[in-house]
Protein backbone atom coordinates (compact mmCIF):
# COMPACT_ATOMS: atom_id res chain seq x y z
CA UNK A 1 0.00 0.00 0.00
CA UNK A 2 2.81 2.43 0.86
CA UNK A 3 4.42 1.84 -2.53
CA UNK A 4 1.09 2.47 -4.26
CA UNK A 5 0.54 5.78 -2.45
CA UNK A 6 4.12 6.82 -3.22
CA UNK A 7 3.64 6.06 -6.93
CA UNK A 8 0.23 7.74 -7.17
CA UNK A 9 1.44 10.90 -5.43
CA UNK A 10 4.87 11.09 -7.08
CA UNK A 11 3.99 13.86 -9.55
CA UNK A 12 1.92 16.01 -7.19
CA UNK A 13 3.25 19.00 -5.26
CA UNK A 14 2.59 18.16 -1.61
CA UNK A 15 2.79 20.41 1.48
CA UNK A 16 6.24 20.50 3.08
CA UNK A 17 5.34 22.04 6.45
CA UNK A 18 7.33 20.22 9.14
CA UNK A 19 5.11 18.63 11.77
CA UNK A 20 5.92 17.47 15.28
CA UNK A 21 4.42 14.22 16.59
CA UNK A 22 2.04 14.20 19.52
CA UNK A 23 2.44 11.90 22.50
CA UNK A 24 -0.11 9.41 21.18
CA UNK A 25 1.23 6.50 19.11
CA UNK A 26 -0.92 3.94 17.26
CA UNK A 27 0.39 0.41 17.82
CA UNK A 28 -0.42 -2.20 15.19
CA UNK A 29 0.46 -5.83 14.51
CA UNK A 30 0.92 -7.58 11.18
CA UNK A 31 -0.97 -10.71 10.17
CA UNK A 32 -0.44 -12.82 7.06
CA UNK A 33 -3.33 -14.84 5.63
CA UNK A 34 -2.32 -17.43 3.04
CA UNK A 35 -3.98 -20.35 1.28
CA UNK A 36 -4.13 -22.42 -1.89
CA UNK A 37 -7.20 -22.53 -4.09
CA UNK A 38 -8.73 -25.94 -4.73
CA UNK A 39 -8.50 -27.12 -8.37
CA UNK A 40 -6.55 -24.02 -9.41
CA UNK A 41 -3.93 -24.99 -11.99
CA UNK A 42 -1.76 -22.16 -13.23
CA UNK A 43 1.94 -21.59 -13.86
CA UNK A 44 3.90 -18.59 -15.16
CA UNK A 45 7.39 -19.80 -14.17
CA UNK A 46 10.12 -18.47 -16.45
CA UNK A 47 7.81 -15.77 -17.79
CA UNK A 48 6.69 -13.55 -14.91
CA UNK A 49 8.47 -10.25 -14.29
CA UNK A 50 7.27 -7.06 -12.56
CA UNK A 51 10.13 -4.99 -11.10
CA UNK A 52 8.46 -1.72 -9.99
CA UNK A 53 4.66 -1.99 -9.62
CA UNK A 54 3.49 1.36 -10.97
CA UNK A 55 -0.21 2.42 -10.94
CA UNK A 56 -0.35 1.15 -14.53
CA UNK A 57 0.98 -2.21 -13.32
CA UNK A 58 -1.69 -2.32 -10.62
CA UNK A 59 -4.42 -1.64 -13.19
CA UNK A 60 -2.96 -4.36 -15.42
CA UNK A 61 -3.03 -6.79 -12.48
CA UNK A 62 -6.69 -5.96 -11.83
CA UNK A 63 -7.38 -6.60 -15.52
CA UNK A 64 -5.65 -9.98 -15.28
CA UNK A 65 -7.77 -10.78 -12.24
CA UNK A 66 -10.89 -10.52 -14.41
CA UNK A 67 -9.76 -13.65 -16.28
CA UNK A 68 -10.09 -15.63 -13.04
CA UNK A 69 -13.71 -14.91 -12.14
CA UNK A 70 -14.16 -17.65 -9.53
CA UNK A 71 -10.89 -16.92 -7.76
CA UNK A 72 -11.63 -13.18 -7.89
CA UNK A 73 -14.99 -13.76 -6.22
CA UNK A 74 -13.34 -15.61 -3.32
CA UNK A 75 -10.56 -13.06 -2.83
CA UNK A 76 -12.83 -10.02 -3.19
CA UNK A 77 -15.32 -11.42 -0.68
CA UNK A 78 -12.52 -11.98 1.83
CA UNK A 79 -11.16 -8.47 1.27
CA UNK A 80 -14.58 -6.95 2.01
CA UNK A 81 -14.62 -8.77 5.35
CA UNK A 82 -11.09 -7.69 6.23
CA UNK A 83 -11.56 -4.02 5.27
CA UNK A 84 -14.09 -3.60 8.06
CA UNK A 85 -11.80 -5.18 10.66
CA UNK A 86 -8.23 -4.34 9.67
CA UNK A 87 -6.07 -2.41 7.22
CA UNK A 88 -4.87 -4.12 4.03
CA UNK A 89 -1.14 -3.92 3.35
CA UNK A 90 -0.94 -5.95 0.14
CA UNK A 91 -2.38 -8.90 -1.78
CA UNK A 92 -0.56 -11.68 -3.62
CA UNK A 93 -2.17 -13.79 -6.34
CA UNK A 94 -0.04 -16.12 -8.47
CA UNK A 95 -0.97 -14.71 -11.93
CA UNK A 96 0.07 -11.13 -11.05
CA UNK A 97 2.29 -11.45 -7.97
CA UNK A 98 2.05 -8.72 -5.35
CA UNK A 99 -0.67 -6.23 -6.25
CA UNK A 100 0.88 -2.99 -4.98
CA UNK A 101 4.33 -3.68 -3.55
CA UNK A 102 7.50 -5.61 -4.33
CA UNK A 103 8.40 -8.66 -2.23
CA UNK A 104 9.51 -12.27 -2.48
CA UNK A 105 7.00 -14.69 -3.97
CA UNK A 106 5.32 -16.98 -1.41
CA UNK A 107 4.54 -20.65 -1.93
CA UNK A 108 0.75 -20.35 -1.87
CA UNK A 109 -1.71 -19.11 -4.49
CA UNK A 110 -3.04 -16.26 -2.35
CA UNK A 111 -1.53 -14.13 0.42
CA UNK A 112 -3.14 -11.14 2.12
CA UNK A 113 -1.06 -8.98 4.45
CA UNK A 114 -3.01 -6.96 6.99
CA UNK A 115 -2.21 -4.77 9.97
CA UNK A 116 -4.62 -4.62 12.88
CA UNK A 117 -5.19 -3.49 16.43
CA UNK A 118 -8.29 -5.56 17.16
CA UNK A 119 -8.74 -9.21 18.14
CA UNK A 120 -6.82 -11.68 15.97
CA UNK A 121 -9.09 -14.46 17.25
CA UNK A 122 -12.13 -12.68 15.80
CA UNK A 123 -10.40 -11.99 12.48
CA UNK A 124 -9.15 -15.58 12.21
CA UNK A 125 -12.56 -17.10 12.96
CA UNK A 126 -14.28 -14.96 10.34
CA UNK A 127 -11.63 -15.78 7.72
CA UNK A 128 -12.01 -19.51 8.40
CA UNK A 129 -15.81 -19.30 8.35
CA UNK A 130 -15.85 -17.35 5.08
CA UNK A 131 -13.43 -19.68 3.27
CA UNK A 132 -15.05 -22.91 4.50
CA UNK A 133 -17.44 -23.35 1.50
CA UNK A 134 -14.61 -22.90 -1.02
CA UNK A 135 -12.46 -25.86 0.06
CA UNK A 136 -9.20 -23.93 0.19
CA UNK A 137 -6.03 -25.76 1.21
CA UNK A 138 -3.10 -24.90 3.48
CA UNK A 139 -4.96 -22.04 5.13
CA UNK A 140 -2.81 -20.08 7.55
CA UNK A 141 -3.71 -16.99 9.61
CA UNK A 142 -0.63 -16.01 11.59
CA UNK A 143 0.80 -12.89 13.16
CA UNK A 144 4.38 -11.96 12.43
CA UNK A 145 6.96 -10.50 14.78
CA UNK A 146 6.59 -7.17 13.00
CA UNK A 147 5.08 -4.47 15.20
CA UNK A 148 4.27 -1.04 13.83
CA UNK A 149 4.23 2.20 15.79
CA UNK A 150 2.47 4.94 13.83
CA UNK A 151 3.08 8.53 14.93
CA UNK A 152 0.11 10.85 15.26
CA UNK A 153 0.04 14.61 14.71
CA UNK A 154 -2.24 17.48 15.52
CA UNK A 155 -3.83 19.16 12.52
CA UNK A 156 -1.64 22.14 11.52
CA UNK A 157 -2.77 25.50 10.20
CA UNK A 158 -1.41 24.61 6.76
CA UNK A 159 -3.81 23.87 3.91
CA UNK A 160 -3.86 20.22 2.80
CA UNK A 161 -3.88 18.98 -0.78
CA UNK A 162 -5.79 15.91 -1.87
CA UNK A 163 -5.16 12.99 -4.20
CA UNK A 164 -7.96 10.70 -5.38
CA UNK A 165 -7.36 7.31 -6.99
CA UNK A 166 -8.97 3.90 -7.21
CA UNK A 167 -8.62 1.78 -4.07
CA UNK A 168 -6.36 -1.04 -5.28
CA UNK A 169 -7.76 -3.74 -3.00
CA UNK A 170 -11.40 -3.18 -3.94
CA UNK A 171 -12.26 -1.09 -7.00
CA UNK A 172 -15.80 -0.60 -5.70
CA UNK A 173 -14.14 2.14 -3.63
CA UNK A 174 -12.05 5.23 -4.31
CA UNK A 175 -9.06 6.21 -2.19
CA UNK A 176 -8.86 9.79 -0.90
CA UNK A 177 -5.53 10.93 0.57
CA UNK A 178 -5.00 14.32 2.21
CA UNK A 179 -1.42 15.56 2.68
CA UNK A 180 -0.81 18.14 5.44
CA UNK A 181 2.97 18.16 5.94
CA UNK A 182 6.06 16.06 6.64
CA UNK A 183 7.83 14.47 9.58
CA UNK A 184 11.38 13.24 8.95
CA UNK A 185 11.11 11.49 5.57
CA UNK A 186 7.40 10.72 5.76
CA UNK A 187 4.38 12.64 4.55
CA UNK A 188 1.63 13.12 7.11
CA UNK A 189 -2.09 13.27 6.60
CA UNK A 190 -5.18 11.10 6.57
CA UNK A 191 -6.64 8.59 4.09
CA UNK A 192 -10.22 7.59 3.40
CA UNK A 193 -12.13 5.18 1.22
CA UNK A 194 -15.59 5.84 -0.16
CA UNK A 195 -17.90 4.02 -2.61
CA UNK A 196 -16.86 4.95 -6.15
CA UNK A 197 -20.31 6.29 -7.03
CA UNK A 198 -19.82 8.97 -4.37
CA UNK A 199 -16.89 10.50 -6.26
CA UNK A 200 -18.78 13.66 -7.39
CA UNK A 201 -19.93 14.27 -3.81
CA UNK A 202 -16.43 13.75 -2.39
CA UNK A 203 -14.97 16.26 -4.84
CA UNK A 204 -17.54 18.92 -3.96
CA UNK A 205 -17.03 18.31 -0.23
CA UNK A 206 -13.25 18.67 -0.56
CA UNK A 207 -13.24 21.80 -2.72
CA UNK A 208 -13.50 24.36 0.12
CA UNK A 209 -11.18 22.32 2.36
CA UNK A 210 -8.04 21.76 0.27
CA UNK A 211 -5.69 23.76 -1.93
CA UNK A 212 -6.16 21.41 -4.86
CA UNK A 213 -7.45 17.98 -5.83
CA UNK A 214 -5.41 15.76 -8.13
CA UNK A 215 -7.22 12.71 -9.45
CA UNK A 216 -5.56 9.70 -11.02
CA UNK A 217 -7.39 9.05 -14.28
CA UNK A 218 -7.56 5.59 -15.84
CA UNK A 219 -6.98 6.03 -19.57
CA UNK A 220 -6.76 2.31 -20.51
CA UNK A 221 -3.10 1.34 -20.78
CA UNK A 222 -1.84 4.43 -19.03
CA UNK A 223 -2.80 6.86 -16.27
CA UNK A 224 -2.68 10.62 -15.97
CA UNK A 225 -3.08 13.06 -13.09
CA UNK A 226 -5.92 15.56 -13.49
CA UNK A 227 -6.16 18.72 -11.41
CA UNK A 228 -9.82 19.11 -10.66
CA UNK A 229 -9.76 22.18 -8.46
CA UNK A 230 -7.38 24.79 -7.10
CA UNK A 231 -8.55 27.29 -4.48
CA UNK A 232 -6.94 30.03 -2.42
CA UNK A 233 -9.82 30.32 0.05
CA UNK A 234 -10.34 27.29 2.24
CA UNK A 235 -11.90 26.20 5.52
CA UNK A 236 -10.23 24.14 8.22
CA UNK A 237 -10.50 20.40 7.59
CA UNK A 238 -12.74 18.83 10.29
CA UNK A 239 -10.40 16.29 11.87
CA UNK A 240 -8.23 16.42 14.96
CA UNK A 241 -5.58 13.78 14.36
CA UNK A 242 -3.25 12.92 11.50
CA UNK A 243 -0.81 10.04 11.03
CA UNK A 244 2.10 9.23 8.81
CA UNK A 245 0.62 8.24 5.44
CA UNK A 246 0.41 4.44 5.60
CA UNK A 247 -2.03 1.53 5.33
CA UNK A 248 -4.49 3.14 7.74
CA UNK A 249 -7.65 4.19 5.91
CA UNK A 250 -10.98 5.34 7.30
CA UNK A 251 -14.46 5.30 5.82
CA UNK A 252 -15.33 8.78 4.59
CA UNK A 253 -18.24 10.01 6.70
CA UNK A 254 -20.15 12.51 4.56
CA UNK A 255 -22.39 13.43 7.48
CA UNK A 256 -19.45 15.32 9.01
CA UNK A 257 -19.52 17.79 6.12
CA UNK A 258 -22.08 20.16 4.57
CA UNK A 259 -24.16 18.59 1.81
CA UNK A 260 -22.97 19.76 -1.65
CA UNK A 261 -25.49 21.76 -3.65
CA UNK A 262 -23.78 21.67 -7.05
CA UNK A 263 -21.63 19.13 -8.86
CA UNK A 264 -18.89 19.49 -11.46
CA UNK A 265 -19.29 17.15 -14.47
CA UNK A 266 -16.45 14.62 -14.66
CA UNK A 267 -15.08 13.29 -17.94
CA UNK A 268 -12.58 10.99 -16.24
CA UNK A 269 -12.60 8.11 -13.78
CA UNK A 270 -9.99 6.66 -11.42
CA UNK A 271 -10.93 3.15 -12.56
CA UNK A 272 -12.64 1.83 -15.69
CA UNK A 273 -13.85 -1.81 -15.63
CA UNK A 274 -12.13 -3.89 -18.29
CA UNK A 275 -11.77 -7.47 -19.45
CA UNK A 276 -9.38 -9.23 -21.83
CA UNK A 277 -11.01 -10.90 -24.85
CA UNK A 278 -9.97 -12.78 -27.94
CA UNK A 279 -11.53 -11.72 -31.22
CA UNK A 280 -12.77 -15.31 -31.47
CA UNK A 281 -15.10 -14.64 -28.55
CA UNK A 282 -16.76 -11.63 -30.14
CA UNK A 283 -19.97 -12.04 -32.16
CA UNK A 284 -19.67 -12.54 -35.91
CA UNK A 285 -21.19 -10.34 -38.61
CA UNK A 286 -21.95 -7.31 -36.45
CA UNK A 287 -20.20 -3.94 -36.36
CA UNK A 288 -17.64 -3.53 -33.59
CA UNK A 289 -16.05 -0.22 -32.58
CA UNK A 290 -12.49 -0.13 -31.26
CA UNK A 291 -10.10 2.52 -29.93
CA UNK A 292 -6.32 2.40 -29.56
CA UNK A 293 -4.67 4.26 -26.69
CA UNK A 294 -1.29 3.92 -25.00
CA UNK A 295 -0.41 0.80 -26.99
CA UNK A 296 -3.65 -0.94 -25.97
CA UNK A 297 -6.51 -1.65 -28.39
CA UNK A 298 -9.94 -1.99 -26.81
CA UNK A 299 -13.59 -2.31 -27.77
CA UNK A 300 -16.26 0.16 -26.64
CA UNK A 301 -19.32 -0.76 -28.76
CA UNK A 302 -20.76 -3.96 -30.25
CA UNK A 303 -23.66 -3.76 -32.70
CA UNK A 304 -24.00 -0.01 -31.96
CA UNK A 305 -24.43 -0.63 -28.21
CA UNK A 306 -22.03 0.91 -25.69
CA UNK A 307 -20.45 -1.66 -23.39
CA UNK A 308 -20.45 -1.35 -19.60
CA UNK A 309 -17.07 -3.06 -19.47
CA UNK A 310 -14.20 -2.16 -21.79
CA UNK A 311 -12.94 -5.20 -23.76
CA UNK A 312 -9.16 -5.21 -24.18
CA UNK A 313 -8.17 -7.06 -27.36
CA UNK A 314 -5.67 -9.90 -26.90
CA UNK A 315 -3.96 -9.97 -30.31
CA UNK A 316 -2.39 -13.03 -31.89
CA UNK A 317 0.63 -12.97 -34.21
CA UNK A 318 -1.61 -12.52 -37.25
CA UNK A 319 -2.76 -9.08 -36.08
CA UNK A 320 0.11 -8.03 -33.83
CA UNK A 321 1.08 -5.14 -36.14
CA UNK A 322 -2.49 -3.93 -36.69
CA UNK A 323 -3.94 -0.99 -34.77
CA UNK A 324 -7.64 -1.34 -34.03
CA UNK A 325 -8.94 2.20 -34.28
CA UNK A 326 -12.32 2.46 -35.96
CA UNK A 327 -15.00 -0.08 -36.82
CA UNK A 328 -14.78 -3.64 -38.11
CA UNK A 329 -16.81 -6.78 -38.77
CA UNK A 330 -15.38 -10.27 -38.23
CA UNK A 331 -16.49 -13.85 -38.67
CA UNK A 332 -15.25 -17.12 -37.23
CA UNK A 333 -14.04 -19.75 -39.71
CA UNK A 334 -12.23 -23.08 -39.91
CA UNK A 335 -9.02 -22.49 -41.88
CA UNK A 336 -6.55 -25.33 -42.55
CA UNK A 337 -8.03 -27.29 -39.66
CA UNK A 338 -7.74 -24.37 -37.24
CA UNK A 339 -10.69 -22.56 -35.69
CA UNK A 340 -9.89 -18.90 -36.23
CA UNK A 341 -11.44 -15.69 -37.54
CA UNK A 342 -11.05 -13.19 -40.31
CA UNK A 343 -11.85 -9.49 -40.60
CA UNK A 344 -14.31 -9.13 -43.46
CA UNK A 345 -14.70 -5.35 -43.24
CA UNK A 346 -12.81 -2.61 -41.41
CA UNK A 347 -12.16 1.14 -41.46
CA UNK A 348 -8.45 0.51 -40.74
CA UNK A 349 -5.87 -1.69 -42.50
CA UNK A 350 -5.66 -5.35 -41.42
CA UNK A 351 -4.22 -8.50 -43.02
CA UNK A 352 -6.81 -10.87 -44.50
CA UNK A 353 -7.22 -14.59 -45.06
CA UNK A 354 -9.50 -16.24 -47.54
CA UNK A 355 -12.02 -18.74 -46.26
CA UNK A 356 -11.55 -22.24 -47.68
CA UNK A 357 -14.87 -23.04 -49.31
CA UNK A 358 -14.01 -26.03 -51.49
CA UNK A 359 -12.79 -28.34 -48.74
CA UNK A 360 -14.49 -30.14 -45.88
CA UNK A 361 -14.22 -27.94 -42.82
CA UNK A 362 -12.81 -30.24 -40.17
CA UNK A 363 -11.35 -28.60 -37.10
CA UNK A 364 -8.43 -30.13 -35.22
CA UNK A 365 -9.37 -30.87 -31.60
CA UNK A 366 -7.22 -30.66 -28.50
CA UNK A 367 -9.00 -33.60 -26.85
CA UNK A 368 -12.08 -35.83 -27.34
CA UNK A 369 -10.91 -36.26 -30.92
CA UNK A 370 -13.32 -39.16 -31.61
CA UNK A 371 -16.42 -37.29 -30.46
CA UNK A 372 -18.94 -36.06 -33.03
CA UNK A 373 -19.89 -33.25 -30.65
CA UNK A 374 -17.60 -30.25 -31.22
CA UNK A 375 -17.36 -26.94 -29.38
CA UNK A 376 -14.76 -24.79 -27.65
CA UNK A 377 -13.87 -23.51 -24.22
CA UNK A 378 -12.12 -20.17 -23.94
CA UNK A 379 -8.79 -21.91 -24.59
CA UNK A 380 -9.38 -25.23 -26.35
CA UNK A 381 -11.28 -27.02 -29.12
CA UNK A 382 -12.85 -30.29 -28.01
Curated annotation (Swiss-Prot):
Subcellular location: Virion
UniProt GO MF annotations: DNA binding
One GO biological process term: viral process
Signal peptide positions (record): none
Primary location group: virion
Induction entry: Expressed in the intermediate phase of the viral replicative cycle.
Keywords (A to Z) from UniProt: DNA-binding, Virion
Function: Binds to the hairpin form of the viral telomeric sequence. Might direct genome encapsidation into the virus particle.
Name of the protein described by the UniProt record: Telomere-binding protein OPG082
Organism for this UniProt entry: Vaccinia virus (strain Western Reserve) (VACV)
Lineage of the species this protein comes from: Viruses, Varidnaviria, Bamfordvirae, Nucleocytoviricota, Pokkesviricetes
Amino acid sequence: MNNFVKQVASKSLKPTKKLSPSDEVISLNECIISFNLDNFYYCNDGLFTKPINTPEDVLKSLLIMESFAYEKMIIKGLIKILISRAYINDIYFTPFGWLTGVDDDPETHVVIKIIFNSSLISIKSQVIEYLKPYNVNNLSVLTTEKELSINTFNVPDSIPMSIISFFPFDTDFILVILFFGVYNDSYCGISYISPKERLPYIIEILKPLVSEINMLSDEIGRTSSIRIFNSTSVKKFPTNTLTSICEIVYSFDESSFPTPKTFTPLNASPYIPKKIVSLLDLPSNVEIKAISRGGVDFITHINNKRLNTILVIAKDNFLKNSTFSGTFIKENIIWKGIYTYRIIKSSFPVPTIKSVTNKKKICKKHCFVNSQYTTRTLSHIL
